Amino acid sequence: SMNGVVDERMSFKAGQNLTVKGVPSIDSTNFAINVGNSAEDLALHINPRFDAHGDQQAVVVNSFQGGNWGTEQREGGFPFKQGEDFKIQITFNSEEFRIILPDGSEIHFPNNRYMHFEGEARIYSIEIK
């Protein structure tokens, strides 16, 4: 079960491919995958929203640092279903994160925090709400 907060604390290096698998609950409103050093320092926040924060079936990507969210990036398409398995792949370099969604579509998001990783990113938490 992936209800609540799952703190994976896994690290991965530039060029490595990280695969995240999960199942949103049947009544899930949204879930998030956070890559960063802590809850206050997230280089990558992937937030698929079934029905949350005024969005329906939207994938929102952002970063969070110094108590502030960055600029939200929204992507078309929503290849997630409540109660169904998903797989997301994440890889990064000094320039950007590349996120491959379950349907094979890609999101590119700038890696603004590369120096703080010293070449290594960390899955801070996976939350399903």
UniProtKB/Swiss-Prot annotation:
Q: Which residues form a coiled coil?
A: none
What is a single molecular function from GO for this protein? carbohydrate binding
Q: Which residues carry this modification: N-acetylserine?
A: S1
Q: Which InterPro entries match?
A: ConA-like_dom_sf (IPR013320), Galectin-like (IPR044156), Galectin_CRD (IPR001079)
* Residues noted as binding a beta-D-galactoside in the record, renumbered to the chain: W69, G70, T71, E72, Q73, R74, E75
Gene3D superfamilies from the UniProt entry? 2.60.120.200
Matching entries from Pfam families are given as:
Gal-bind_lectin
Q: Which SMART domains match?
A: Gal-bind_lectin, GLECT
Q: Where is the Galectin domain?
A: 4-129
What's in the keyword line of the UniProt record? Acetylation, Lectin
Please give the GO cellular component terms listed in this UniProt entry.
Answer: extracellular space
What's its job? This protein binds beta-galactoside. Its physiological function is not yet known.
The molecule here is called Beta-galactoside-binding lectin
Q: Which organism is it from?
A: Electrophorus electricus
